[in-house]
Design a protein with these regions (language model features):
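Histidine/acidic-residue-rich, glycine-tolerant segments that coordinate divalent metal ions
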Residues: 1-84, 168-169
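A conserved active-site cap/scaffold subdomain adjacent to cofactor or substrate pockets
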Residues: 81-106
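Short amphipathic alpha-helices in soluble, non-transmembrane regions
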Residues: 105-114
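An extended, acidic, His-containing surface patch that forms the Zn2+-binding/catalytic region
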Residues: 127-175
């Protein structure tokens, strides 16, 4: 998770690693022949709108200085070139540096997904798997660890990590 030289020890006060949550969205529409699109509810199109709406939400409703990432890793829909898709599956992760931002994104994601599905006549299922919390290093403990490491290997072999990473870390339960 880092590109720091071997033999160096980094420390970080405050937020060090992001929270991570998984999302699984299923859009249920009504498939049909591509020549009769008015008789269908195009789940693929609705799914695409969900992805672009979430990306727009992230860039316009989240403070740019408040690190947060919405990533779609899987988008599955359709089975033939001449058939309007009856379902779409969208899966990915949300990563944040603040608990308040995490809650805000998850709440609004549900509103966006439900709203778009309702607007286009589809139904949906949203599953959120809450993963790791934000790793926030205690200032007093970090200062103590920093001094111990500096005494052990020398101050010149230690450095303060400049910014938190957007990866998640199991160590968040201990920090």
């Amino acid at each position: 998770f880092n590109n720091y030289p071997c033999g160096m020890v980094g420390y970080k006060f405050g937020a060090k690693a992001s929270s991570t949550d998984e999302f699984y969205i299923k859009v249920i529409g009504k498939g049909g022949h591509a020549g009769l699109p008015h008789q269908t509810i195009d789940a693929l199109s609705i799914g695409a709108k969900i992805v672009t709406a979430m990306e727009s939400f992230m860039s316009r409703r989240i403070d740019p200085f408040d690190s947060a990432v919405f990533s779609v890793g899987i988008f599955e829909s359709g089975s033939a070139i001449n058939i309007v898709a009856d379902s779409a599956k969208i899966s990915g992760t949300i990563r944040c540096q603040k608990d308040e931002t995490r809650a805000y994104i998850l709440k609004n994601m549900e509103q966006i997904v439900n709203g778009l599905c309702q607007a286009y006549g589809a139904t949906c299922k949203i599953d959120i798997i809450h993963g790791l919390p934000v790793q926030v290093n205690d200032a007093e403990t970090t200062e103590y660890a920093k001094k111990v490491v500096e005494q052990a290997i020398g101050k010149e072999k230690t450095f303060e990590i400049p910014q938190p990473m957007m990866g998640a870390e199991d160590f968040s339960y201990y920090a």
